Amino acid sequence: MTASLELELQSFVLLRLGERRFAVSARQIAELVAPSSVFRFPHHTPKIEGVILRRGRIVPVCDVSEALTGERLTSRRFYLIAVRRYGAQTEWVALPVTGECELINGEMTAAGEADAPHVAGWLSHDGDVIEVLNLDALTPGTDGVLGERAARGALEARP
């Protein structure tokens, strides 16, 4: 293996949602944890079904399966805790997965203009072509209506 080829290889975590596999850059993964109690409460954030408590943090649970496969998950094997970026800030988000996760090294092909915004690129692994997910586009953020609502709430809360 040449030095130039080694530089192009990146680490990815393969995750299973139903029958399909997806990939996330390993740099975005904090940990993989067993399912725990999801605390549900009234809120206005779409795609967030509740929160879990992990290592002293409140971590939002975001089931992205419906956006990716067209079906909501009925069972969960693990939560993949990923790092979501909001501008200059970061936050953990828990993604429910239905099967084992796998760490692989591979060369990612960049997404094209015709690809959906949640696709960061593509991997070829074991004869399959796998979507590499752009979590910033797939999970809810502080942009648009949510950002305006949060800013309005922050201004109203000031003395």
Over which residues does each language-model region extend?
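An acidic, low-aromatic, low-complexity terminal/linker signal
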Residues: 1-159
